[in-house]
Amino acid sequence: MSNVPAAVKNLIIINALVMVMTALNENFMYEKFALFYPTSPFFHWWQPLTHMFMHGGFWHLFFNMYTLWIFGSQLERVWGAKKFLLFYFVTGLGAALVHTGVEWLQMQNWLAEAADGSYAAQLSIHSLKMTPTVGASGAIYGVLMGYAMLYPDAVMALVFPPIAMKAKWFVLIFGAVELLTGLTETGGNIAHFAHLGGLIFGYLLMMYWRKSRTLYY
């Protein structure tokens, strides 16, 4: 990893170390550092930040860190470590904000149904409060947006399906898929709106930098 920029390298190392710590004491790590809904008994104020360093398994970690290495390294080379880290954490925290906001909307519907005596709604409320969210994926999607806006015509190759497309179309398609799967509640235990939030905050920050003429420094 000698050719990997410092900030990206340190992020990868920290994420890997947290994975090891989670394997050694999973219950403690999840209860303290995963992201819980604000009214959950397990919620702590630092979780919107710390959940970005936790992952649900080796492959979750691997694909996020691989994407960070490929695309984050290029952004850091252009921006420098400080600006890249600002972008990374703003998009990651923005992803957590969007994810929690969508959960809040779900909670309002369930609370109304529970007030009418719905047992299913009560179970949904309990499940939402007890279910943790982990992963750097929100920030990673922000990184993809940043790359696509800096290099819109760069060709990105998908592993599955094995096709190549320009970065601007890649990000647009991924965003549409995340929105569709989020709205239809398909795709398993994946925080689709967190991914979408990373894209949104990445776009907003890139537009702000573009208007302030600080996009490349």
Language model: regions and residue ranges:
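A detector for small-residue-rich transmembrane helices and their helix-helix packing motifs
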Residues: 1-217
